[in-house]
Amino acid sequence: MQAKGIQLAAAVLLLVGSWANAVEVPADVLFARKIQPLFKVKCLTCHGDDPEKLKGDLDMRTRAGLLKGGESEESALVPGKAMTSPLYLAVTRAHEADWSAMPPKENDKLSAEQIGYIKEWITAGAPWPDAKRVVAILKEADPWGETDGVMVKTSGGLDAGWTNRKYDPQKLWAYQPVSKPAVPAKGHPVDAFVEARLPKGLAVVPQAEAVTLIRRVTYNLTGLPPTPKETFEFVAAWKKDSESAWVALIDRLLASPHYGEQMAQHWLDVVRYADSAGFSNDYPRPHAWRYRDYVVRAFNADKPYDQFVREQIAGDELEPNDPDHLIATGFLRMGPWEHTAMSVAAVTRQQYLDDVVNSVGVTFLANELRCAKCHDHKFDPIPTKDFYRMQAVFGSISFMERKLPWQSFENITGIQADRERYLRQQKTKAIRSITTLPEADRPVQEFDKDSERIGQGKVNNKRRQQLKFQLKRSTPLAFSVANDANDRIHILKGGSIETPQGEVSPGVLSLFSGSEKSASVTSEQSGRRTELAQWITSRENPLTARVIVNRVWQWHFGQAIAGNPNNFGGTGKRPTHPELLDWLAATFMEEGWSLKKLHRRILTSATYQRAVAYPTPETLAKLDPNKTSYAVFTPRRLTAEELRDAMLAISGELNRAQGGIPAHPEINEEVAMQPRHIMGSVGPAYQADPKPAQRNRRTLYAERIRTLADPMLEVFNKPGPDVSCERRETATIAPQAFTLMNSPINHARALAFAARLEREKPGDLNLQIVRAFQLTYQRQPLPAEMKACRDHIAKSLAHHKATKPVKVEPPKYVIRQMVEEMTGLDFWWVEDLDIYSGNEYVPDLKPWDAKPHTRALAELCLVLFNSNEFVYIY
């Protein structure tokens, strides 16, 4: 084991130290290409940009300045001797006893490769060619660049070396015009393109069975299971004419209002939707839900995708009097953001501008534009100037809660009841002393009275501020933006507002036009975003259609054609089927950017309808190790939202009402009661809505609080709303099984399911079991399954007849503890839970209220909910 460890260490050292042998170049070329640009980005902010404020009195603008040294009065540079040069010793960060680590911030430290360049340059005598020689060097071929690559004209980088560099053409695939290649064979175009790239020796599998297909496509398009009636009717139609039955099913599902909800869930993953602002204060966003509902409506109406994009970027400019256009601009504010009395306005404003540019890039162009924030993009032809020119597009906007009356198409149920609840809370004291509790229930018997008085007063004041935010929800406002700012945007050296460089004018990415001028948009306060949106949705823009087509493909197959839907750049995965992607993108634009037509085209292909099993799995694994051939359909697990919604639908509890203010479903009680920092204090405990119909809505409509995740959803890989999610992960971990089997919330679903079976098939256990299988699996139980179910219920019934469940009441209050900052002592208070302690709360069916037979039948229902056949889509 020791020898193995030594070999590993030697390998690491070889990796770090072998950089110098990769490219052998003259030292002056090394300086011009690597050292001088490195100094500009990493060093001159403190040691040269402002000669009057040189940190440590060290001037790194010239060789003479380095030789002179700084406050230590020791030369920072010993030409020919890197190991005695303080400059080299400082950047290695390995000699901090003698020389402070430089750059000082850990996240700014140099890479091993950069440190190696400095070492080689010093060892070679640290030459410093004059400006004329540097210009000449930069016009020559870059020894580290792509020798056979292509140059891309842009608005220009921060240095000539970047501007003139070459790129591997294969990594620029996404920036090439969308073509419409000829379909390689007769039949369905999708199948023709897929089968043209099948590995030699690999055949496609036959079509899946009808029941498998209706389950697959119903979940994919609506996020809900098909009903037994829908399944029966489809199978009957399939037997008569499978092709027409399949097309009719797809059309019915695309016309379902639940289609828009399922597609909106995908979209909200990308745009980072949440009902709170995040960060330490996590301010509520009382009207963000109107954007969520706008997205649902847009998908259901099959709004042309190019129009959908334009409305979200510039809806207020395009149609300032149209409600949906105003609501759509909520997209521009979806990211986490916070500004408090402690914040520096310029910093938080810059954070917003950085975020919104990157969000537009990721969402619509599949480009992480923030990679060009501190320096020219390392892998793509996107100069820093373009990043800040796009910021200038948004420099005219400010946040606005626009007055916008509730619309006839909006669901405003519950808004008035919400308002009345919060008004009641305003009139009562939000918290009370622990002395109001029986002595046995108090956490302590003695405490400092002054700390309690001061601390409770502060907490109470904060509660009232929080209530004011909640009351805003009853006022009809749109979470939007307006053109009433006039920021002057500069390139920020290193991305820092403390080092502004040249001012820039509004513009778009210049790599498509080749110059700054041709990539410019208006400098007028209004209209910038309109021109940006028009550029993004232009048919000449090669990214936009490819990006959304790629996303839709992934929504159906679980993997995208280009494997990184948020990154079409040089570091992203290249398309496995580039001709198919281009053909779909070109056709998508030709057909009016219709997403429903795109879905229909993909879903009617044999590729989508394939079975999941290959006759010789070892052949499939050998010829298609990355599972990109589509010779079979790859099964997927239900998403967290689909899992919860399906259990509610099957148990008969799902409230299918659409839209409206966020719902508050039941979540894990321990998490709900835990203290949560909000608005500079402890936020109120999470309480579920009082009525089952309110809390048992689709998960899409559940309130998304950035600092309070539902554990049930989180454990099944629901992404957080802080970062754009390009692809849902489906990790398999033990807590998933524990949650699905042991969670009291899932037990409640199983109990409600059992009660439904008893209502629909009273007194007949056989019919109840059959109905359970039909609802959960869309099929009849096999004889062996029927016997196993009957045997288990018989044994379980005897147990439940002999055992009476103990009644458990919901908590009526929670005790909180904090340290009073003025005294440094602990204080406590009691927070009353108004919903649980009032008369409004109607619990779900509980074991102590259910008959023994219901509880026994619920055990079977719970097993069905925990089975792979339910949890996975095949």
Language-model region placement:
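Bacterial N-terminal signal peptides
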Residues: 7-18
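Solvent-exposed helix-loop boundary motif
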Residues: 21-119, 128-191, 195-196, 211, ...
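Protein kinase-like catalytic domain
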Residues: 39, 47, 122-126, 254, ...
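Active-site histidine-acidic residue metal-binding/catalytic motifs
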Residues: 99-103, 116, 124-137, 142, ...
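Primarily short, surface-exposed interaction patches in extracytoplasmic proteins
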Residues: 185-258, 272-320, 381, 421-694, ...
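Beta-propeller blade termini and top-face loops
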Residues: 263, 268-270, 274-286, 291, ...
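Globin-like tetrapyrrole-binding proteins
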Residues: 860
